[in-house]
């Protein structure tokens, strides 16, 4: 899996961004297509916001549109991240590993930690709304310069209310 590197001083330099996938910047998710099936997952930068993943909760969906929530992930400080789909289509598979070992989402975001597989309805259209690893890194550097809340605000949901 080739990777696009960044200048050592760039804020995104510490993150792996494989060049063999497409990225949806505002949601910080990626997609990789093979034989009409898109494997999707979260990016390493989003994983840093989560820091710790005690739970991945899948939403009961069969068909998804771009941006629609596939799952939510609880992170540190009770923050919940919505994992939005970068492609439209029919859900083929949810990663069963994440139920048993949710930490795989962060430990191997581009490998065993994928979130779902989707039969893409129109990959060409969806791909046009995504960016390459190089473009995502550039967007990420600009957004990180404005602050983490600005950069990751599109994926974050409100903290969960404390249990009574």
Where are these regions (language model features)?
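Non-catalytic terminal segments and appended small domains
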Residues: 1-60, 66-69, 77-83, 90-164
């Amino acid at each position: 899996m080739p990777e696009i590197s960044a200048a050592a001083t760039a804020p995104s330099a510490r993150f792996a961004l494989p060049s063999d996938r497409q990225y949806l910047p505002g949601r910080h998710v990626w997609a990789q297509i093979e034989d009409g099936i898109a494997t999707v997952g979260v990016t390493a930068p989003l994983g840093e916001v989560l820091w710790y993943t005690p739970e991945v909760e899948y939403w009961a969906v069969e068909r998804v549109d771009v941006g629609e929530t596939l799952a939510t992930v609880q992170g540190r400080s009770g923050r919940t991240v919505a994992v939005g789909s970068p492609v439209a289509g029919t859900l083929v598979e949810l990663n069963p590993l994440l139920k048993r070992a949710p930490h795989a989402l962060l430990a191997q975001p581009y490998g065993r930690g994928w979130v779902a597989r989707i039969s893409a309805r129109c990959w060409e259209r969806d791909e046009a709304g995504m960016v390459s690893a190089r473009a995502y890194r550039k967007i990420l550097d600009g957004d990180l310069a404005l602050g983490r809340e600005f950069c990751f605000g599109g994926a974050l949901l409100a903290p969960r209310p404390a249990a009574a």
